[in-house]
Amino acid sequence: MKVLRVNLDEKSYDIVIQKDLKDYFGEYIKTVFDGKKVAIITDDNLNDIYGEAIKKNIENEGFEVEVISVTPGEKSKSFSVLPGIYNKLLDFKLTRSDLIIALGGGVVGDLAGFVASTFLRGISFIQIPTSLLAQVDSSVGGKVAVDLERGKNLVGSFYHPELVLIDPNMLGTLPEKYFNDGLGEVIKYGCIKSKELFEKLEGFENKEDLKENIGEIIYECCNIKREVVENDEKDLGERMVLNFGHTLGHAIEQIYNYEIYSHGEAVAIGMNMISKIAEEKDLTKKGTAERIESLLKKYGLNTDVNIEDNGLAREAIKLDKKNLNGNLNVILLKDIGEGYIYNTTVEFFE
């Protein structure tokens, strides 16, 4: 078992990483929650696989448990889904002294976290991430949000969980496409903060070799994010480097209506494309983009897509949350393991 402590001024919490942790979820929940009712928000796929077993596991600790399931996919992370969830919480008579659990990948984590932050002006919640992307990235750091038609994550808040429970063995039910999706974020961490991690990923013989070491990889990624979040909780400085590849990535997701490329796949393309642009402008060490592209391809990720002359891409970039005071902050690399913030305008991409 590995435990990381996220230490923040107003709220601190543990990230627990352990194979087969799902058999002990109820026990761990009891260490941070002494109320009566627990509402689990998940999606239909995960509910079919884990819902009943996890519900019983938590009930065995004396809690009253309700499972609320949504349609899988990014389109559930929208305002149209919220009233249905709020009404089910009201039917369950959930109070501010009760608990919400986010059981799922990045979409469920963002959605359930947003519900927790807004229902009755705020209810405690726990993250139980089940996808690689959520385990290494989105479950840590307190960002919760829903999408608007004009862009991703445009309405949200910073709302930290009481606890993050990560069972790497739950990745065994994850479709390969979404394992690759998470690898996009894993590679990002190596790019921005850890040359050692990047080279470790280069050194694995293949994806199966990586999977045998997945617990260690998850720990390294969470530890990097923990350090960054502790230094810049509200995303006004250093934390922006975590968005390497995301400016173009979010635009790609939006252009394809969230149906072709998953978040991690789009970020992978964004990292490759922006590194090539930066090299052409002598803002990134020559050869960096080639190494990134090679590593992405090694793990089955796309590296390019045509978004030229697309007005929607330009508008999506303008709405990027790293835009401050009329300027666009893009995340570039000096070299592998050295991400930095570069102040520019949308014309950078033209």
Curated annotation (Swiss-Prot):
GO molecular function, one term: nucleotide binding
GO process annotations (BP): amino acid biosynthetic process; aromatic amino acid family biosynthetic process; chorismate biosynthetic process
Compartmental location: Cytoplasm
InterPro entries: Dehydroquinate_synthase, DHQ_synth_AroB, DHQ_synth_fam, DHQS/DOIS_N, DHQS_C
Residue positions binding NAD(+): G106, V107, V108, G109, D110, T130, S131, K143, K152
Keywords: Amino-acid biosynthesis, Aromatic amino acid biosynthesis, Cobalt, Cytoplasm, Lyase, Metal-binding, NAD, Nucleotide-binding, Zinc
Listed EC numbers: 4.2.3.4
Catalytic reactions on record: 7-phospho-2-dehydro-3-deoxy-D-arabino-heptonate = 3-dehydroquinate + phosphate
Cofactors: NAD(+); Co(2+); Zn(2+)
Cofactor stoichiometry and binding remark: Binds 1 divalent metal cation per subunit. Can use either Co(2+) or Zn(2+).
Residues that hold Zn(2+) according to the record: E185, H246, H263
GO cellular component, one term: cytoplasm
Pathway involvement of the protein, from the record: Metabolic intermediate biosynthesis; chorismate biosynthesis; chorismate from D-erythrose 4-phosphate and phosphoenolpyruvate: step 2/7
Cited function: Catalyzes the conversion of 3-deoxy-D-arabino-heptulosonate 7-phosphate (DAHP) to dehydroquinate (DHQ).
Family of this protein: Belongs to the sugar phosphate cyclases superfamily. Dehydroquinate synthase family.
Cross-referenced HAMAP family: DHQ_synthase
Official protein name in the record: 3-dehydroquinate synthase
Source species: Clostridium perfringens (strain 13 / Type A)
Annotated gene: aroB
